[in-house]
Amino acid sequence: MENIKTTTEQLRTEANIQRKKVSEVAKDLVEFCEKNKATDMLVSGPLDAHNPFQEKKSCSVL
């Protein structure tokens, strides 16, 4: 019975959450990414000089 009460309470809480349209939120997300892309590593990626995962280039003589 306790499980049903907990589930009911959770569902009521979720039902009261104010929702926004995906089209509005997507526009806000794109604006945020464009505004912060110069400093956001997840958007622009690391600089090649500071990327520890980049393969080391070696000099080969033919």
From Swiss-Prot:
<dbReference type="Pfam" id="PF00631">
    <property type="entry name" value="G-gamma"/>
</dbReference>
<keyword id="KW-1003">Cell membrane</keyword>
<feature type="propeptide" description="Removed in mature form">
    <location>
        <begin position="60"/>
        <end position="62"/>
    </location>
</feature>
<dbReference type="GO" id="GO:0005834">
    <property type="term" value="C:heterotrimeric G-protein complex"/>
</dbReference>
<keyword id="KW-0488">Methylation</keyword>
<feature type="modified residue" description="Cysteine methyl ester">
    <location>
        <position position="59"/>
    </location>
</feature>
<protein>
    <recommendedName>
        <fullName>Guanine nucleotide-binding protein subunit gamma</fullName>
    </recommendedName>
</protein>
<dbReference type="InterPro" id="IPR001770">
    <property type="entry name" value="Gprotein-gamma"/>
</dbReference>
<dbReference type="GO" id="GO:0007186">
    <property type="term" value="P:G protein-coupled receptor signaling pathway"/>
</dbReference>
<keyword id="KW-0449">Lipoprotein</keyword>
<comment type="subunit">
    <text>G proteins are composed of 3 units, alpha, beta and gamma. Interacts with gpb-1 and gpb-2.</text>
</comment>
<keyword id="KW-0636">Prenylation</keyword>
<comment type="similarity">
    <text>Belongs to the G protein gamma family.</text>
</comment>
<dbReference type="InterPro" id="IPR015898">
    <property type="entry name" value="G-protein_gamma-like_dom"/>
</dbReference>
<comment type="function">
    <text>Guanine nucleotide-binding proteins (G proteins) are involved as a modulator or transducer in various transmembrane signaling systems. The beta and gamma chains are required for the GTPase activity, for replacement of GDP by GTP, and for G protein-effector interaction.</text>
</comment>
<keyword id="KW-0472">Membrane</keyword>
<dbReference type="GO" id="GO:0031681">
    <property type="term" value="F:G-protein beta-subunit binding"/>
</dbReference>
<feature type="lipid moiety-binding region" description="S-geranylgeranyl cysteine">
    <location>
        <position position="59"/>
    </location>
</feature>
<keyword id="KW-0807">Transducer</keyword>
<dbReference type="GO" id="GO:0050909">
    <property type="term" value="P:sensory perception of taste"/>
</dbReference>
<dbReference type="InterPro" id="IPR036284">
    <property type="entry name" value="GGL_sf"/>
</dbReference>
